Amino acid sequence: MKNILLTALISAGCLSAYAQSKPGKEDDYYRIITMPIPETIKMEVGGLAVLPDGRLAASTRRGEVWMIGNPYLKGDGKPSFQRFASGLHEPLGLLSRGKDFLISQRGEVTRLEDTNNDGVADVYDSFARWPLSGNYHQYSYGPVAMPNGELLVTLNLDWVGRGASQSKWRGWMLKLGEDGKLTPYATGLRSPSGFGSYKGDIFYTENQGDWVGSGRMTHLEKGDFAGNPAGLRWSKEEGSPVKLTPQDVPNTGEPLYDVAKKVPGIKPPAVWFPHTIVGISTSDFKEDVTNGAFGPFAGQVFVGDQGHSIITRVDFEKVNGVWQGTVFPFREGFMSGIIRMVWGLDGSMFVGQTSRGWSATGKADFGIQRLVWTGKMPFEMKNVHSMPDGFEIVFTSPVDKKSAADQDAYKLNSFTYKYHQTYGSPIINTQEVPLKGIVVSEDGLRVRLVVDPAVLRKGYIHEIKAEGVKSPDGNPLLHTTGYYTLNEIASGTPVSASQFTTTVKASAPDHSMHTMPAEASNTAPSAKRVIEMPKDWTNGPDQVVTIGTVPGLKFDISSIQVKAGSRIKIIFNNNDDMLHNLVITKPGTANAVGEAGLNLGLKGSELSYVPRTNDVLFHSNIVEPEKSEAIYFVAPKQPGAYQYVCTFPGHYTLMQGKLNVVK
């Protein structure tokens, strides 16, 4: 803690600095330092713990625990590694208790202790146990200690083409007593790899899947049901605080917030993470308790994303007793999939990563990196607050008042997701949120965006773009968009028109509800997506190809050869447990097409993440897990090395193949 305070004092002068004289990059403010790891160690991190003596403990999916000396890379810059434990079953957590460790394996929490001080665990005690089905998807997480000393574990659902709870308490959060007793706390969880405390309350992160339209972060209280009904199989068991049964959960496709108003016990999320826009698989999170050593976001939450290899930032607030808030992009460019994060003794952040079987945009199989604030002040939206008539943005440093008062500097939309059994959801009910007025504070640190209260929708994600806001030096925000989940609207006195810095010319708000069924949301007819055999193919296709997937974000066929001008039928069989598509592109354009799909924003799901470009020749729809789709096309007449790629965001860099067209 002394080191943290010292760092904060040294950096105090930087906190008042304005944005840099040239447009900033993330690396200017938060530097990623990669820890060198010996080639003989497969450091597929499942858990991290910082020890008081400065060492870093890491559990790995290979069943080992390593003690890492000099993790801050001081002196000669070389860390040391000593294996502390081995033979564990894919541990995905690690808790240091001083004299021992608690670690979750697939089927138990194990207590590890070194009683003879030789640096190697000689005690492996079974601390708490639960049954297993043998399903590959039965991951177990924790334990995590709460500020009051209570311990928590979470148990992942099975995957059988859908989420299932094939053994007791799968899909639940459980409290773990000092005697090893497990007490059920809440259910509705699907893949709860990230959980812990924020301001003393319990939160957990969730990944898109069945019954989960997009990633989210939920405040869990005893007896809550967070959405996936598989775990309700055990709600009648002794000790269950949950009263709902699977039959109580409607599969109507209405938004989760609306369903929760009708079915007591369902808990809507505090914050949604719009899928593919701010990640695809939320993982660990950490509240910033560094007292400024990590920059200007003390008290906020940083959330890892395994699939996109990024960290996002969440600014929470409690309105009418309900947690809600904004998620912002924060830092991209990590080497692998982020699964664990922990604060170092100096206020930097250790980031443990792995991608085997799960895949990630970071191309390394695993790694440990450290994220360090450089002391420079990023020009960012620091907070967004709910107001009775809109939102107030607080910036990290003063804005250029002229640009901040320009009505064209902002664009607001709201949208949500379906709550249904289908895997994921398209964005639905998109609606523009027109501005009425703008109020820029005298000190330039706050901007109030005033709207007609009638267009604010509870339970909806409100996209707040501030692309036109500049610093006094003329630089844009480092990240220009935030996504505010509006569960409650703050009370207070609305701003009067006489207080506006800018009065926005009135226009009729678009109240249209662009609701699209999940099955039809991205199935618009297209000559590039033909899913019925053309009638003039009287003799059928000349060639039929069936292509599937293998673990690691790969197609199971890396190369296909077809004759120029031939009639082709490709059956894409998605035998994976995540969403994919199949897009055939011109030679050498797969990466560009994939990047364009990534940048589609709110329109991505509607377009099946297939950008409208001449580089796309043919494509499938987004295909759900365990489903398939056939497409028909005539092969190009020009021979060449064409490509096929999955353009679902985060997949395109790895999931590619060659379509060789020959004479």
Language-model features: locations:
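Beta-propeller domains with acidic blade repeats across secreted/periplasmic ectodomains
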Residues: 20-378
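Acidic, Ser/Thr/Gly/Pro-rich low-complexity segments and short DxT(G/T)-type signature motifs
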Residues: 375-380, 400, 466-521, 525-526
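Extracytoplasmic beta-sandwich strand-turn segments characteristic of Greek-key/jelly-roll folds
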Residues: 428-438, 442, 590-637
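N-terminal edge beta-strand
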Residues: 375-376, 537-567
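Extracellular/periplasmic metallocenter environments
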Residues: 521-531, 614-663
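Surface beta-strand/loop "capping" patches
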Residues: 374-401, 408, 552-553, 561-564
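Beta-strand cores of secreted/periplasmic/IMS beta-sandwich domains, seen most often
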Residues: 49-50, 55-56, 64, 196, ...
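Short, surface-exposed alpha-helix to beta-strand junction/turn motifs within ectodomains of secreted
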Residues: 394-437, 464-470, 480-484, 584
